[in-house]
Amino acid sequence: MAKVLVAIRVNPEDIDVDLDKLVNEIKARMPEKFEVVRHEKVYIAFGLYALRLFIIMPEEYEGGTEDLEELLTSIEGVSSVDIEMVTRTEAF
């Protein structure tokens, strides 16, 4: 069964948000069958960094990435999210 790999940028509310804690909070709140397989910090400007997450989710998940976006924006410290890429994969 194929899965979907989503690259999503998570923008913090401000420069003081601890991105390591934010990643742990996001991983803890992922629904069943969703997995953060990789994350990295992305420099924005003036000392501000965002998170780029690579998340595996079921291909047949109803609603696509909408629920994932809502979940991420509901977490304290998250200002907004941007879907950067969605691709089908059988590698995971």
What are these regions (language model features)?
Residues 1-92:
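Long, contiguous binding/interaction regions
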